[in-house]
Amino acid sequence: MARTKQTARKSTGAKVPRKHLSSKSSFPSKPVNEVLKKTHRFRPGTVALREIRRYQKSSDLLIKKLPFQRLVREIAQEFKTDLRFQAAAIEALQEATEAYLVGLFEDTNLCAIHAKRVTIMVKDIQLARRIRGERA
């Protein structure tokens, strides 16, 4: 197919209604019940269990590196300005942080199960921290 040069067309500024060449549409219309196709939905809890298995298999970090690094620098700024961090130091902090959070959520889940619930709540986290001796 040969390329052709496009020339500028003068615009009138007003919208002109388009002319319909044929009264019938080019594709056959479907009945109403075929048009609205239901999207597939998994049963409640299926996707959550799949995510649990996926994250338990993996060993990579779950918190994004740059936001965590910014948070560390922001907290360190309160104690001393112009601090520098090695990449390995921030990575070690992130490993320790994620290990702590995973352990806390495991204990929190046990507290929720003890209360005959499956949903964790703030009071479960508070109880887990209190039992650990982190909070008076």
Swiss-Prot record:
Residues the record lists as Phosphoserine modifications: S11
Residue positions, PTM N6-methyllysine: K5, K10, K19, K24, K37, K80
Major site of localization recorded for this protein: nucleus
N6-acetyllysine modification, residue list: K5, K10, K15, K19, K24, K37, K57
GO molecular function, one term: DNA binding
InterPro entries assigned: Histone-fold, Histone_H2A/H2B/H3, Histone_H3/CENP-A
Cellular localisation: Nucleus; Chromosome
Biological process terms in GO annotation: asexual reproduction; cellular response to UV; epigenetic regulation of gene expression
Subunit structure of this chain's protein: The nucleosome is a histone octamer containing two molecules each of H2A, H2B, H3 and H4 assembled in one H3-H4 heterotetramer and two H2A-H2B heterodimers. The octamer wraps approximately 147 bp of DNA.
Protein's UniProt name: Histone H3.3 type c
Species for this entry: Dictyostelium discoideum (Social amoeba)
Classification lineage: Eukaryota, Amoebozoa, Evosea, Eumycetozoa, Dictyostelia
